[in-house]
Amino acid sequence: LSSAASDVYKRQIHNYLKDEKLTEDLTLTFTKHSEMRYGENPHQSAASYVIPGNVEPNIMNAKIHQGKKLSYNNIMDADGALACVREFDETACVVVKHANPCGVAIGDDILDVYQRAFNADSLSAFGGIIAFNRTCTKEVADAIAKVFVEIVIAPGFEKEALEVFKKKKNLRVLELGKFNKREKKIEIRNVDGGIPVSYTHLTLP
């Protein structure tokens, strides 16, 4: 199974494992979403798959306003950025590069939050992925446009912000719609011969 569909994969697992009851049998069905130029490395073939009917905001069903097709590594990094930023109730920004967060900040003002997250490690943030859990404003878009990043992710974008981003033709802009913090999620690991599955609680009881 391609881990490119990891987030929606977890949601389907959740439907099978309601109330934390681990069933005896688990059947998963996916539909091909798109072919990719290559996988994690140039010599590897790859494709992305989605769960039919899944409507929860995720990278696979995001509205892509502009930019070229997402690569395998783009999807993995974007999914990681989204998973991190959606954990916060406060206004938050997460910067991810090569599957690792290199800047995270929370606060009241989205521009201040972006600047602190980016400046936490501005060298690593160069060419990275930026995710917000609030609507991206024109003011924030103006700041992002001054640096090189691969992808910007947010629940929504002001019309003026999208106009700013249009000047950066290679930038991917992903709109997910409103998403909420989850109390728990399913963790799946792909190992030879099977998949270990467990619940991870995101809030304290």
Show where each model-derived region lies.
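Single conserved hydrophobic/aromatic residue that forms the stacking wall/gate
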Residues: 1-5, 9, 201-204
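ATP-dependent carboxylate/acyl-activation modules
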Residues: 10-202
